[in-house]
Amino acid sequence: MPSPFSMPMIFILVVAVILAGTVSVAGTAPSVTTAATRSTYLESLHTPLTAKWPDNRLVYLVCHGHSVPAGYFRTPTIRPFDSYPHLTGRIVQDRYPTAMFEVVRTAIGGENAEQGAARFAEDVLAKKPDVVTIDYGLNDRWIGLDRARAAWSSMIEAAQAAGVEVILLTPTGDTSANPDDASDPLVLHAGQIRELAEEYDIALVDSFAMFEQYRAGHGTIEPLMSQSNHPNRAGHALVAQELARWFTELEPPAAE
């Protein structure tokens, strides 16, 4: 069916998201039951993010996962500066202009959570990040729910043991999935990731719900996609907006 969004409009929305961090293509993401709240979850980072030289320090966000955070658009093309890790960094840097905010991608195309867990200590924790995001839902369909849960849990627990804050991401859209079918593997993996966020009381970016809100309003997610399973810049900007909110909506700790 014809796209309800023209390319100029998509461009305007993407620019607005990047520069302001306040415009949503699909509206506000549904709330998920978890103890994590944006105003306090990363409150320990409020001081380093707002500090000025010479008192500021590097704040590291590591984005771990598969081809989406790696920046794959239409395979084999990689566009890291149009992907959500980089776009998130731009939004956060605009919010905290004196911060030294560094985003590092440890994502590998084609990887699932078991493979990501196997190299988590060496590739992620060794970098001593302040925050790590985990995004494997799309590829975990090929290993099943039980194996995926075990791998996600191992990464979450390893990060927490190292004092690293964790933000989970549900999968971005896939035009081959049937989100209206409760038994669709992508639906099931998105649900399991939400459960993990609740179980561990950690932050969540519900990318799957945002893409579905867009589909409900526009009849298709095609304007957000570069190919069936990879978002385009507009899709990445949608994820970046929500991820950045965990940093930009921080309130000062009570002691400050």
Residue ranges and their predicted role:
Residues 68, 76, 105-111, 133-141, ...:
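Cell-envelope and extracellular/periplasmic
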